[in-house]
């Protein structure tokens, strides 16, 4: 099914973000786990099923990050692997009516690792990270941050337009992190400095709770005032139902 996976992956990214720029696409069964180059990728000959889809989709996703949007992966690995991991999650959920759809991540389970005070920040260059932390900091934490931004802060419509615009504006150029941050804010029409600061520039922890509940003028018929407090430094919107 390699050809099917290659076709579906490229068509998804071309339709959702920006058209695939090369006249051909080649997926080679090789000895390595997975590696990408312009127009050609290498995937393990042993991979099959969900594993083959995952590596094929991931390696072709790199055509968009960092080949079309030419970020400096040696300095900012998250703008390469993190962005690609994020768009892979959307592609996987859509492929063949959800054949390999991911289970929602348990962010409560991941939070301890994501916000450890011993962890370097996402903005650290990969060569300044402990090797054991590169997967988390370059792939998973930035991808989770984009999921939070899409699902909890901006909403799918605003976020998808903002990311598509970022790709279009910076295609075949070399953006820095601030170029990404400012483009998302510009298109979304919202100051997100509080989010970039907490999730990307620091490892701030999210801990929110209800501080107090009071009736308006002590009269339940007039409604209730609920006060929410941040017990840690990270901020996030809260919905009360």
Where are these regions (language model features)?
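Juxtacatalytic substrate-recognition/specificity segment
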Residues: 1-79, 83-87, 95-96, 128-133
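Asparagine-centered strand-capping/turn motif at beta-strand->loop junctions
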Residues: 228-232
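Extended low-complexity, serine/threonine- and proline-enriched intrinsically disordered segments
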Residues: 238-241
């Amino acid at each position: 099914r390699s050809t099917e996976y290659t076709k579906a992956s490229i068509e998804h990214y071309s339709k959702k973000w920006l058209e695939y720029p090369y006249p051909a696409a080649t997926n080679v069964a090789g000895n390595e786990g997975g590696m990408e180059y312009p127009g050609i990728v290498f995937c393990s000959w042993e991979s099959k099923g969900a594993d083959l889809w995952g590596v094929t989709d991931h390696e072709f996703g790199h055509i968009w990050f960092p080949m079309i949007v030419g970020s400096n992966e040696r300095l900012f690995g998250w703008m390469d692997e993190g962005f690609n991991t994020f768009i892979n999650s959307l592609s996987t959920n859509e492929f063949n009516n959800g054949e390999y759809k991911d289970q929602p991540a348990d962010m409560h389970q991941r939070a301890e690792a994501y916000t450890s005070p011993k962890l370097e920040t996402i903005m650290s260059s990969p060569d300044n990270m402990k090797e054991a932390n590169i997967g988390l900091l370059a792939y998973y934490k930035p991808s989770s941050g984009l999921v939070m931004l899409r699902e909890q802060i901006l909403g799918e419509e605003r976020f998808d337009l903002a990311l598509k615009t970022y790709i279009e504006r910076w295609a075949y150029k070399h953006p820095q992190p601030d170029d990404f941050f400012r483009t998302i804010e510009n298109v979304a029409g919202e100051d997100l400095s509080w989010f970039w600061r907490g999730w990307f520039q620091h490892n701030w922890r999210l801990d929110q709770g209800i501080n107090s509940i009071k009736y308006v003028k002590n009269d339940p018929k007039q409604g209730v005032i609920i006060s929410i407090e941040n017990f840690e430094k990270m901020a996030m919107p809260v919905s009360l139902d």
